[in-house]
Amino acid sequence: MELTTRTLPTRKHIALVAHDHCKQMLMNWVERHQPLLEKHDLYATGTTGNLIQRATGMDVNAMLSGPMGGDQQVGALISEGKIDVLIFFWDPLNAVPHDPDVKALLRLATVWNIPVATNVSTADFIIQSPHFNDAVDILIPDYARYLAERLK
C-alpha cells in the first residue's frame, strides 16, 4: 500500500482506554501527568472517561462503555484521523466478552500508525518524549490511492 504523510498537531487528541482491572492504574497515570494532559483533547470509553472527569475535573469526550461499543467508537475516530495517540491499558490475563473489539482497536491504531501505549512504561515514554508537545509527521495509508486502485 502507498503511504502519505499526516501531521499530528501540537495539541493532540488522546484516547484513554482501560479494562476494569487496569482502570486504577490508568487513573494513577492520568493524575500523575495531569498538567501535561490538560494541554490536549482527551477522549475515552464511557466508564473510564467518567472516572477521569470525576477524579481530575478535566474535560473528557466520553464514548460508550467499551463492551457497549465504545472501543469501536474510538477505532472509528482513529480511522477518521481524529485520534493522535492511544493509551490503552488492557488486561492480558483476563478475557473480556468484547475481545474482538479490543483486537480491532489495536489493529486500527497499528494500520493508521499512531503512537500506542498498552502499559505504564510505554505511556511514560510517549508522554515524556520531546516530541509529545510538537507537531509530528507520521506515515499513514494513502486511502484515496488505495480506493482508486480498487475501483479501476
UniProtKB/Swiss-Prot annotation:
Chain ranges passing through the membrane: none
Molecular-function GO terms, alphabetical: methylglyoxal synthase activity
Residues at the catalytic site: 71 (proton donor/acceptor)
Class of the enzyme per the UniProt entry, highest EC level: lyase
Enzyme Commission designation: 4.2.3.3
One Gene Ontology CC term in the entry: cytosol
Chain residues that bind substrate: 19, 23, 45-48, 65-66, 98
Keyword Lyase: yes
SMART domains per the UniProt record, alphabetical: MGS
Annotated keywords: Lyase
Residues covered by the MGS-like domain: 6-152
GO process terms (BP): methylglyoxal biosynthetic process
Reaction catalyzed: dihydroxyacetone phosphate = methylglyoxal + phosphate
Known function: Catalyzes the formation of methylglyoxal from dihydroxyacetone phosphate.
Family: Belongs to the methylglyoxal synthase family.
Name this protein carries in UniProt: Methylglyoxal synthase
Species this chain originates from: Salmonella gallinarum (strain 287/91 / NCTC 13346)
Gene: mgsA
